[in-house]
Amino acid sequence: MAAALQTNIRTVKVPATFRAVSKQSLAPFRVRCAVASPGKKRYTITLLPGDGIGPEVVSIAKNVLQQAGSLEGVEFNFREMPIGGAALDLVGVPLPEETISAAKESDAVLLGAIGGYKWDNNEKHLRPEKGLLQIRAALKVFANLRPATVLPQLVDASTLKREVAEGVDLMVVRELTGGIYFGEPRGIKTNENGEEVGFNTEVYAAHEIDRIARVAFETARKRRGKLCSVDKANVLEASILWRKRVTALASEYPDVELSHMYVDNAAMQLVRDPKQFDTIVTNNIFGDILSDEASMITGSIGMLPSASLSDSGPGLFEPIHGSAPDIAGQDKANPLATILSAAMLLKYGLGEEKAAKRIEDAVLVALNNGFRTGDIYSAGTKLVGCKEMGEEVLKSVDSQVPASV
């Protein structure tokens, strides 16, 4: 059985003379937004608290971000703008033009959460979630980075056995703006038999594949040097092109070991043996599914950050969890995913790796000291609310000696 599961995994060694040829693929992509400048020490950050628990966790992350930055000589100018349901209530649209302008003019954007029961019956164009799609489009972010790390302090919170979950540390790099979610034609029509038919189109151009592949190769290079490209090349033409382009780029990254895996196998392998993965790159819909699957290995989506990057301009950083309207305003939310999103903002958005390391280390210290919000609580640890968890992380940022990279 195990052997059968591995049959569609293939390590690729590409001749040095075979390279992708699109103009876009010839430009190097650094895993950091173009606004990042190592010499710059003052940044404008647009905060989008959004709905539900969003304002609570963003407020805490802002304080941690500001403190970590100040210890490394970094200053921030914060601008808070409405999005989602909050914007609907305020001005009648999920993403006001003023919010778009502020986001574009900033160095990075930190988002809380979007949505809630209150707006569930709105028309499609007036749903809070529309604001998220619109801000992604406005910022032209195309690469979504989703880490899934099982921390030693939380290994027992995983849904998998300890021996399977322990040591998992992977990154899913998801293409964010192409594929079946955006392809045309799409719609619902009535066929010649009078039956309704729904249809969508999976479309990828070579340059779209090349640019996400470059982000993935660069990410893998900075991690453990292993990249697994996930597709469905045995069935889908779009995946055949995907595999071809990713393979072609491999020769430019001889220090990265490339393998390919079909998406159905990848879904099984993430549960069977997640430690085999370092960096995964895949298309929009596969990445949407696999990154959620990977997140559950960690035990709580309240721990997981994400980064969405563009070729140029500000990146969008947000926790992967939803707005959790059922616990909003009750001091029950886990702020760690948003705090870690702030760390990703520093690392990938601004290039401030020392300040980012301070935040990452502070989260570990708070967990080592036994503090837990309800979603990660277990016997023998101290149950705390959202605010107290934030305060503990803030104390840990303060107590650290200068961070090293």
Swiss-Prot record:
Transit peptide: 1-33
E.C. number: 1.1.1.85
Coiled-coil annotated spans: none
Residues given in the record as NAD(+) binding sites: 114-129, 234, 265, 318-334
Swiss-Prot/TrEMBL keywords: Amino-acid biosynthesis, Branched-chain amino acid biosynthesis, Chloroplast, Leucine biosynthesis, Magnesium, Manganese, Metal-binding, NAD, Oxidoreductase, Phosphoprotein, Plastid, Transit peptide
Effect seen on changing residue 234 to A/D: Loss of activity toward 3-isopropylmalate
SMART domains (alphabetical): Iso_dh (SM01329)
Residue list for modification Phosphoserine: 70
Site feature Confers substrate specificity, where: 133
Gene Ontology biological-process entries: embryo sac development; L-leucine biosynthetic process; pollen development
Phenotype upon changing residue 146 to A: Reduced activity toward 3-isopropylmalate
Keyword Disulfide bond tagged: no
Cofactor note: Binds 1 Mg(2+) or Mn(2+) ion per subunit.
Required cofactor(s): Mg(2+); Mn(2+)
Phenotypic consequence of gene deletion: No discernible vegetative or reproductive phenotypes except a slight reduction of both male and female transmission efficiency, but decreased leucine biosynthetic enzyme activities and lower free leucine concentrations. The double mutant ipmdh2 ipmdh3 is lethal in male gametophytes (small aborted pollen grains abnormal in cellular structure, and arrested in germination) and had reduced transmission through female gametophytes (slow embryo sacs development).
Effect after changing residue 264 to N: Loss of activity toward 3-isopropylmalate
Residues reported to bind substrate: 136, 146, 174, 264
Binding site for Mg(2+): 264, 288, 292
Family classification: Belongs to the isocitrate and isopropylmalate dehydrogenases family.
Quaternary context: Homodimer.
Name assigned to this protein: 3-isopropylmalate dehydrogenase 2, chloroplastic
Protein's organism: Arabidopsis thaliana
